[in-house]
């Protein structure tokens, strides 16, 4: 369980874009509302009906794809990795390495605000392990264990 600090550290979209290589329509963290290096990060994703995935998923009943919830978690782990271990060298990147125990509990629809909470568990040989939870209005909609790796390209 995460222990939140009273002095919140935040990141706006400009700082997020300086750390992650993703861009529209694949940048899935709009804002970081709190983080502590080596411990946790809380990010927000505002789900809008104007996003391209809703033209086909599904036109009659738009549902935010579960794989994009997991990608948002992966991006949050990348941000926490940057803040915990520092920026990689010019020829390095944090890669999403694996996901385990992914569970989807409720659908996410346009108008929802996803709160992505990731918690750093441990690091070994350049591979970091995290727990991730996505919530809407305080209800868990998805949870998973994620790994990211720092590698040269």
From Swiss-Prot:
Catalytic reaction equation(s): a (3R)-hydroxyacyl-[ACP] = a (2E)-enoyl-[ACP] + H2O
Pfam families: FabA
Catalytic site positions: 57
Purpose: Involved in unsaturated fatty acids biosynthesis. Catalyzes the dehydration of short chain beta-hydroxyacyl-ACPs and long chain saturated and unsaturated beta-hydroxyacyl-ACPs.
Lineage: Bacteria, Pseudomonadati, Pseudomonadota, Gammaproteobacteria, Vibrionales
Organism: Vibrio cholerae serotype O1 (strain ATCC 39541 / Classical Ogawa 395 / O395)
Main localization of the protein described in the UniProt heading: cytoplasm
Annotated family: Belongs to the thioester dehydratase family. FabZ subfamily.
Name this protein carries in UniProt: 3-hydroxyacyl-[acyl-carrier-protein] dehydratase FabZ
Localization per record: Cytoplasm
Alphabetized UniProt keyword annotations: Cytoplasm, Lipid A biosynthesis, Lipid biosynthesis, Lipid metabolism, Lyase
Gene responsible for this protein: fabZ
Extent of the signal sequence: none
EC number from the UniProt entry: 4.2.1.59
GO CC annotations, alphabetized: cytoplasm; membrane
UniProt record, GO biological process: fatty acid biosynthetic process; lipid A biosynthetic process
Keyword Lipid biosynthesis: yes
Record-level Gene Ontology MF annotations: (3R)-hydroxyacyl-[acyl-carrier-protein] dehydratase activity
Enzyme class: lyase
Keyword Lipid biosynthesis: yes
